[in-house]
């Protein structure tokens, strides 16, 4: 039986699969990113797309629609100035300018409920266009 986590702010449910895919990304490193969407009819947060281990940041950006909101988590691997391999998990709240106002409000009010379920996120980025979440922005936040 599928378990769901209740979001207090909007009466939104976070499906158990959302946390499961996140934990697989975090601990097993079998995914590079997970994109989440809200299904307005069922009032639930669902997994929209999962990026395989060979996919990178460009594929994540390409998976985000230009006219609808999404949440995403990305496992960013990088090398520090001390030549140490590190990994940081980013939560991205994607709310493009072309998306519906209702969707923007729904995603904004439901964000914290999903964040509580995704334990282990290091940084959060809110973006309305691709320049606000460019690779250099992500790399700069991680270091």
Curated annotation (Swiss-Prot):
MF annotations from Gene Ontology: actin filament binding
Keyword Mitochondrion in record: no
Entries under InterPro entries matching the protein: ADF-H, ADF-H/Gelsolin-like_dom_sf, ADF/Cofilin
GO biological process terms on file: actin filament bundle assembly; actin filament depolymerization
Gene3D superfamilies: Severin (3.40.20.10)
Membership in a protein family: Belongs to the actin-binding proteins ADF family.
Protein name according to UniProt: Actin-depolymerizing factor 5
Organism lineage string: Eukaryota, Viridiplantae, Streptophyta, Embryophyta, Tracheophyta
